Design a protein with these regions (language model features):
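Structural detector of well-ordered beta-strand residues that form the stable sheet scaffold
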Residues: 45, 104-106
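Mature extracellular/periplasmic domains of secretome proteins
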Residues: 56-77, 88-103, 113-128, 132-142
Length: 284
């Protein structure tokens, strides 16, 4: 985790790698900031088992699961995948202990189409971004209209649709369900319901502009970054961290509030009209 980042919740840092606690990848910092934004009054554990390249040892995962058990956590976020398919009895015992104690485990599917060993356990909640022609599984929760703008190292932001960064979105839904007294046994069923699938699977539509004055103001301010073409369509190739961070500054300036991580997804960015209308909706 990048400890220069402000958090609203208490965090305990534990490191099971051969590297320092410093996050040089960005992955861990992003996940923690997304989970931290869910609510105040939470107690977070940042257990580092992946190195700067995003790789880790199975032995580190086992020790981390044991640490989570001993720390009496409620939810374990595993934004990682295991591509080996030889059954590991020690890992299975640890996972079973966690699940039997009522700990909710959330993981993500592979970004390259490979099967995640963890998601083969039907008691573990797995999430994946919905894409065209994707072969779906009844054991996976799909979220449409990814990517979205998410926090990164330092005070920067990126546009990403990686599955890892969808787990906090599901954990937020789990938190809300638990607050509404939904039982752990019924959590997955509720999450699978269409009402919890983010947005629709329809083609993104260009909206009609609502506030022409706001449109003109924003268009002038963002023209320097070349994020939209002459038809006001979003240019994904220009979505560099620098440009996305600048876009967040515009959002914060216009709305007079800190950027909310669940607020700007691809449908809100696809056309300049959509972007302006989304800012306008926050202003109202």
């Amino acid at each position: 985790f990048d400890f220069s980042q402000p958090l609203q919740n208490k965090i305990t840092n534990i490191n099971f790698t051969d590297e320092t606690n410093k996050d040089e990848n960005g992955h861990g910092t992003c996940i923690i900031k997304l989970i931290d934004s869910i609510s105040s009054g939470l107690e977070l554990y940042s257990i580092k088992i992946l190195d700067r390249t995003g790789k880790g040892k199975l032995s580190s995962l086992k020790v981390a699961l044991l640490e989570a058990l001993n720390s009496d956590v409620n939810i374990i976020n595993l934004s990682l995948g295991i591509e080996a398919f030889i059954k590991d009895s020690e890992l299975e015992i640890l996972l079973d202990k966690c699940l039997s104690q009522g700990i909710i485990i959330v993981t993500s599917e592979s970004n390259n189409g490979k099967i995640n060993y963890l998601s083969c356990n039907n008691r573990i909640i797995s999430v994946q971004g919905k894409q065209n022609n994707l072969v779906t599984s009844n054991n996976v929760i799909y979220i449409n209209n990814s990517p979205r703008i998410i926090p990164w190292l330092g005070s920067s932001y990126v546009l990403s649709g990686a599955n890892s960064f969808l787990t906090p979105f599901i954990i937020k839904k789990i938190y809300e369900l638990l607050q509404n007294h939904v039982s752990i046994q019924n959590l997955k069923k509720c999450l699978m319901q269409q009402s919890f699938i983010f947005n629709s699977n329809k083609k993104i539509q260009r909206q009609s502009i609502i506030n022409a004055k706001l449109m003109k103001s924003i268009e002038e301010e963002i023209s320097i970054w070349n994020l939209y073409d002459e038809n006001k369509a979003f240019k994904i190739a220009q979505a560099t961290p620098r440009n996305i961070t600048a876009l967040v500054r515009i959002i914060e300036e216009k709305t007079q509030q800190s950027y909310i991580y669940d607020s700007f997804w691809m449908p809100d960015l696809a056309y300049l009209e959509n972007f302006v209308n989304k800012i306008g909706s926050i202003l109202h």
